[in-house]
């Protein structure tokens, strides 16, 4: 839980002006003063800021007599130092403090006003003491001193070359005369004490031969909590020396040889966890614990780097150093390299994985060859002495660290946030930010994917990004850190941070430094400090810090009252003692924690006190002691208690009603890594001493949920054991039916089963700092490095260390352990509580993948394979098929036979996907089939899936399937598959067809960007004005997808070839589905299909214009479009007026007005106020199209009159625009803007394909009069009588349906279409010489190619112009004017201009004769039977 940040800095600890190398560094007990030793000098430095205080240089005579300096040892009170020299002598130095209290720094501002300090950071408020260093004496014993260590406040322990241990008093050294050989005050002859070897825990220790004659102690370290010393002898044997009492006499001492360690090089002791670490010449480190039963050594774990490390490349271990809190072990090797390990063996950092650049060989020339390590204040800095000093450069490096708040404040395990603390700053990563922001509740995640049955075209924004953010899990959360700098006013005198805490909501943080307290609000982004600085200096936080319901609670020591206290301060008030609450306790507080409304406190006298907390008001708090427990019997010393908490973890084992749900009954204590559970019985008096149950060992940190909700993941105890991985202690519950029967039958029956809990263990890839119970995720931090400069002379040549937040899912680990122990029901219940998580399928996939990899690659036979049980378990969930295929796709093909031999054949699984409508999963199985089956099988199943995907409108899937089918080589249809997986998503694009196709780029079905000025790319190959026989030869069909052919050959002939029938016809499938969509009036789906699948809609519609694109019921088609688009009903059932009544009222109503229909293009809907909406598109006007048609042709064409465009007297139709209309008659804009854009695009495609029926319906839906005008003019120019009759019938049918329903949406718009009906009637009646039977026989095969000019020769010679007779009762009748030989002949290219008037070329006015009227009435009677209305 320690992580380096920034660059390793070079610091100069030599004498000012010199660059001598430093041989040893040692900090005092409180890590404030740093002693640096060179060959001939001793320097004392202040830790922060790192400045020198005192120096002492030895004389030449002293160097010749005693040799150079080797190492330095501080006295615990920081007043004396013992210096060991190369000759084995001991020099004693005294450190004196100045009595005047003045510091060594005098801050004087310059006289210039511009240079005076204004900012707070420019003032050094720390009073750095003035010290003086002097040599007291030198001690030379009868034997050479090899090493020295301090064992108490007053004693030193010396090891000599004669294999003895000497115990000396500091005071005796002080009063000794110079150069006096002192006799041993207390001598321990190690060759006379027994040494034992305990190879197995159950074996008794046996005596072994004594030490070798020439061996002596080379390395020694003492710990009062283990009652002995860790020692390494000169012959590389490691031992543990223990004494029965503190006098260290030969008769009361014995030793244990460390088993399996024959090449020891260095040793170190962890006081808090009572661990002994021994470094070996093989570059490994072995760690041992003390067995409380026998007092011997018990192997704990081994530290060794194996990843990317060559054997024997590191060399021997030359330094081991535990951090001040015992949470981290720093290891260095002789060949270079530094690593950090957690207490029980989890690797936190290794410089061998750092990026030193390409020019650095870490094996031969490692830049970090270190010989000494020393931790600075609170473990925030690590001093490193390089083995080979560089010329004119300091050999001391300082590496900065941040550490988890759990290291000093274990009660932070209940927080869902990662909080790291530096010496003057905090790093915060809030673990549940996305939960609270986007999900709206704790532990709930929005779905990351669309539903299986969600329609892609269900809304108008289907091709756009969703408005609301979707996140799959907390894994996608931002990994940036929130860095909070400590206020300068507080950090200047209270550096460094000792404790840090954050509330469960992540809104408030509290920090405690050397004295006082400060807290920060993430809402207001402001720090709160004590207004009275003296109150801040009056107490020291010593036992922990936590938040409870808006109060910050701490254990502290009052410097003013000399008492130990519990203090509480509200967050909403200013920091002042008048708002705080104080409770005096009997001894210093070591640790504290909370459970709901209870506070548990451990004091230095070994008493655990439980307090009940309650809020009187927003600013007042009451604390009452509930009971006390004596825990001295379960620990060597209270300082060995790492953490503790109180919980109701085992409430389910008690009969209901014995204890309340909020009442805690269990105390969990971590003593030297052993988890002890103290069960409280509320029915009896609590004894003073308790028997504890050991749940686990080698535990660094544990987590418990304090939530009121009960679930499988919250009723567990989570433990982390370093190299042993993660552990979980969870209850084993019976099935639900048996559980209910047990509750009814009494607690005894239920207790027989429920008294069992199980401890499961599994590995983790990161060090867990936060456990999110509901999300089955652990959060942690990993170190990475970045190289900024590759120059050796640069200050930035060393890598820059950074931190990154990591996460890992552990659900599959727990499920596998439960299934392995035949606890499938418990695993199923746990999985059911997590199945709502978006990454639950991924967890099942990891579960299957781990078992498959382990069993399929095993070289030994597996007697009890776990894969069948895992498959049976996954089969209980609906994601079974998806889990199988996703696991297979991420596994080597060589393992597939083993997987599918137990999971089922891929063909059967594919069929199951189709039956359950899991089409995306079925598509993934095609990859499996392609590699395990012949290509013809995968092609058959892909075609089947393509057909189903089209039916269910899965356009993306259909697109991938088409690419998959096109990627299959036709030559491999019958050949066995090779071991190569072709991904559906990355299948190669189809080969370019040699046939000339229509340019689709400019007309892509873009539903989002809106209308764009389209190229007339289809007009070059699809022309609606050509006769059908010409179109058939000039319009290419849909291009084939499997093979190419010549450009001139029709595509239909190719698709009907024998070879193509043997393969899968993609085009036929697409055309068949497009035909079904068109017949069902699913125009939007047809548009999506063409957009996603690159289907050539215009060319296909040209072929289907007289088949699938032909409508019989226009009103029904319009009704179906409304239903598809979720629009209001166009023809409501309730109606009072029929079409006849409306038509009669129109004939009797007079008035005049001008048309509001313009020639602007798409947006030309008539509005009541006369304004017309104009289209941004630039389309060719109708007049330009007519001018293009004014070319010499076989048809007689009449010229228009100058100054007038009117050829019909449509006075009666002009009155339609001036009729009084109600609100229901007005045109209502019922289409959203984006939907309107899509429909207009479809309309243009239908017009280009000459599909007049659907073009007419779309124009009605869009209420676009200009489009209808263009359609009518195009029909007239096509000279197709049958099409004219169909269009006239369609308009009348729509008009009848509209006026039969009074609430129709198109009532007002249909009124504007009557001139178009009138124009079609006039044109049809103009063909009066054609018999009715001949006109009726004009079928689909001849409507575009029929030549009606022969039948009209007589009429063209007699009739000059037609003028409607407005006085006749029937407005649909024609009257023929007087014939004039000079009149122009009738042209069939009449058009309707923007004002709605019928325009036909006309000459001078004339009167019709009775002969002409009779001829007109006769022709009218003959065509009466041909009319549709």
UniProtKB/Swiss-Prot annotation:
Polar residues bias spans: 1166-1176, 1398-1418
Gene coding for it: Rich
Start-end of Basic and acidic residues biased regions: 1419-1429
Gene3D superfamilies cross-referenced by the UniProt entry: YVTN repeat-like/Quinoprotein amine dehydrogenase
Primary location: Golgi
Name assigned to this protein: Guanine nucleotide exchange factor subunit Rich
Sequence ranges of the WD repeats: 17-55, 64-103, 312-351, 580-621, 862-906
Modified residues (Phosphoserine): 1207, 1391, 1394
Subunit architecture: Component of a guanine nucleotide exchange factor (GEF) complex. Interacts with Rab6.
Cystine bridges: none
Phenotype reported upon loss of the gene: In mutant flies, axons from R7 photoreceptor cells in the eye fail to reach their normal target in brain medulla layer M6, but instead target layer M3. This leads to defects in synaptic signal transmission. Differentiation of photoreceptors is not affected.
UniProt xrefs under Pfam families: Beta-prop_RIC1_2nd, RIC1
